[in-house]
Each structure stands twice: as structure tokens, then as C-alpha cells.
């Protein structure tokens, strides 16, 4: 028989595993990536604030 072009049909088990993997990936994004971006944003705001504040005359 000839080999048909295109992707192989996904079974129910494979589809369920893929969906579970996607859920795990989304959970990791929420617990790792978003806090890291938050920290970077805080450092950026702090850096800009410190560089643009007026000099204190003593």
C-alpha cells in the first residue's frame, strides 16, 4: 500500500496526553515566567526612577 501524505490520526489517549501537557505548560508559565517578568519590571522602574530623580544638594 501507498503511504498517505499528511499527519497520522491522533488517538484519544494521545489527544488526552497532549492536553494534559498543555495544561502543565500553562501552569509553569503562571508560576515561573510571570513572576520573573514582574521582577524585571520592578527593577526597570527602580532603575529609571534612580537615574531620573533630581540630585540632592548638600
From Swiss-Prot:
One term under GO cellular component: membrane
Lipid bilayer topology: Single-pass membrane protein
Compartment(s): Membrane
Transmembrane segments: 31-51
Record keywords, A-Z: Coiled coil, Membrane, Transmembrane, Transmembrane helix
Pfam families registered for this protein in UniProt: DUF4519
UniProt main location, coarse: membrane
Family annotation (InterPro entries): DUF4519 (IPR027960)
Residue runs in coiled coils: 1-31
Family named by the database record: Belongs to the SMCO4 family.
PANTHER family: SINGLE-PASS MEMBRANE AND COILED-COIL DOMAIN-CONTAINING PROTEIN 4 (PTHR34644:SF2)
Protein name per UniProt: Single-pass membrane and coiled-coil domain-containing protein 4 homolog
Upper taxonomic lineage: Eukaryota, Metazoa, Ecdysozoa, Arthropoda, Hexapoda
